[in-house]
Regions:
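Glycine-rich phosphate-binding loop plus the immediately following alpha-helix
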Residues: 35-36, 116-159, 253
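Gly/Thr-rich phosphate-binding beta-strand-loop-beta motif of the actin/hexokinase/Hsp70
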Residues: 1-21, 97-117
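Short glycine-rich, Thr/Ser-proximal phosphate-binding strand/loop in the N-terminal lobe
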Residues: 5-38, 42, 46, 119-122, ...
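Conserved phosphate-binding/catalytic loops in two-lobed NTP-binding clefts
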Residues: 79-83, 230-249
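Glycine-rich phosphate-binding loops at beta-strand->alpha-helix junctions
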Residues: 204-232, 243-247
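Short beta-strand-loop/turn "lid" adjacent to the catalytic site in phosphate-handling enzymes
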Residues: 28-33, 50-83, 120
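Glycine-rich phosphate-binding/hydrolytic loop that grips phosphoryl groups
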Residues: 133-137, 240-265
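Adenine-nucleotide phosphate-binding core of ATP-dependent small-molecule kinases
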Residues: 171-204, 244
Length: 265
């Protein structure tokens, strides 16, 4: 018996296939296109083919994310919020998880969980690009570096530059000025990571960090941001092997639990 989760985000679409034990069999990630229904279907197809399965082998599909409702109308059986799915995925992988930090392409959120894994409180930033993947993407283009290389590059910084602007537009101008003044890109990048950490750290303070702290979302792949955030909040942060797919994975776990609750193996 197999289950699927599909997370259609504003930037990337993710899909996961798991078995009845919750084991991840396959996953797929692709850039979200204008036709979200098509992107979701194609990502789901790539995923079940990777697992050596057919669409009819998937017992239940749960959708989530920015395009969750679109997936629901196109091919999914049910839709759950990102808050619920990221919490479920993080708790499944890290049973002692009490705080989830999700930094995606267009928003960031912090979720507090009780001992049972239920959401006790959450806050999110979805009105400003600062503290999101989009912020780092813009800065990477200005600096002429690859987005995926920013993390490891920042670790080489010896003289970190402080970025005072929290607004993406103003920070963009600030970075250009810093480059013109001769500051090294590596030091600017380290400063940018601190700026993201301060922004997200403000959300963490509203919820209250409690161990274990788990980070999800594509930005979690950036070791520079993770280290800066650990310093900002004063807690060790656990990073899943594939942090970008945790929402989809959590959705798949929910699909499994819903079906097996009705018809246990």
């Amino acid at each position: 018996m197999y289950f699927a989760g599909v997370d259609i985000g504003a930037v990337a679409t993710k899909a996961c296939i798991i078995d009845a034990e919750g084991k991840l069999l396959a996953y797929a990630v692709r850039k979200t296109a204008a036709d979200m229904a098509k992107t979701g279907k194609e990502t789901f197809k790539r995923c079940f083919m990777e697992a050596g399965l057919k669409a009819q082998d998937i017992r239940y599909i749960v959708a989530t994310g920015y395009g969750g409702n679109i997936a629901l109308s196109a091919f999914a059986n049910e839709k759950f919020t990102e808050i619920t799915c990221h919490s479920k995925g993080a708790k499944w992988l890290f049973p002692k998880c009490h705080t989830v930090i999700d930094i995606g392409g267009q928003d960031s959120k912090v979720i507090g969980l009780d001992d049972a894994g239920k959401v006790s409180r959450f806050v999110m930033n979805d009105t400003c690009a600062a503290g999101t993947g989009r912020f780092l993407e813009v800065m990477a283009k200005i600096l002429g570096v690859k987005l995926e290389k920013m993390g490891e590059i920042s670790l080489e910084s010896k003289n970190k530059v402080q970025i005072t602007s929290t607004c993406t537009v103003f920070a963009e101008s600030e970075v250009i000025s810093l480059m013109a003044s001769g500051k090294k890109p590596v030091d600017i990048i380290a400063g940018l990571h601190d700026a993201v950490a301060r922004r997200v750290g403000g959300l963490v303070k509203q919820v209250g960090a409690k161990d274990d702290v788990v980070i999800t979302g594509g930005v979690a792949k950036n070791i520079g941001v993770v280290k800066a955030l650990e310093k900002e909040i004063g807690h060790k942060i656990h990073v899943p092997a594939e942090p970008q797919i945790i929402g989809a994975f959590g959705a798949a776990i929910i699909a499994k639990e819903k079906v097996l609750a009705k018809a246990p193996l």
